[in-house]
Amino acid sequence: MSTRRQAITLYRNLLRESEKLPSYNFRMYAARKIRDTFRANRSTRDFAEIDRQMAEGQQNLELIRRQVIIGHLYSADKLVIENKKTLKPSDD
């Protein structure tokens, strides 16, 4: 598998796992951090640096997976912004 394909696969896996985080704030932070980090390192050409970043990304993927499990064990109430119900307009 090429390095580019590995990076894209890692990127997608990180985003998918971050979507599973139970807390809205953590989900949004993780997705933003993943996108920003990959964009910032898009132009890296040094293979040693790419390998280091890929290893760091794999560690972060495992970290997110653990946090998802912990988050589901100790879940809290959802925030108002997370409610999927739409409010009906009042008849005032």
Swiss-Prot record:
Enumerate the UniProt keywords alphabetically.
Answer: Coiled coil, Mitochondrion
Name the source's superkingdom.
Eukaryota
Task: Cite a single GO MF annotation.
Answer: structural molecule activity
Any Gene Ontology CC annotation: mitochondrial [2Fe-2S] assembly complex
Q: Enumerate the subcellular locations listed in this protein's record, separating them with semicolons.
A: Mitochondrion
* Disrupted gene: phenotype observed: RNAi-mediated knockdown does not affect circadian rhythms.
**Which ranges form a coiled coil?**
48-68
**Presence of the UniProt keyword Transferase in the record:** no
UniProt GO BP: [2Fe-2S] cluster assembly; iron-sulfur cluster assembly
The record ties this protein, via CDD domains, to: Complex1_LYR_LYRM4
Could you describe the subunit structure of this protein? Component of the mitochondrial core iron-sulfur cluster (ISC) assembly complex at least composed of the cysteine desulfurase Nfs1, the scaffold protein IscU, the accessory protein bcn92/Isd11/Lyrm4, and probably fh/frataxin. Interacts with Nfs1.
User: What function is annotated for this protein?
Assistant: Stabilizing factor of the core iron-sulfur cluster (ISC) assembly complex that regulates the stability and cysteine desulfurase activity of Nfs1 and participates in the [2Fe-2S] clusters assembly on the scaffolding protein IscU.
Family statement: Belongs to the complex I LYR family.
Provide the protein name.
LYR motif-containing protein 4 homolog
Species whose genome carries this gene: Drosophila melanogaster
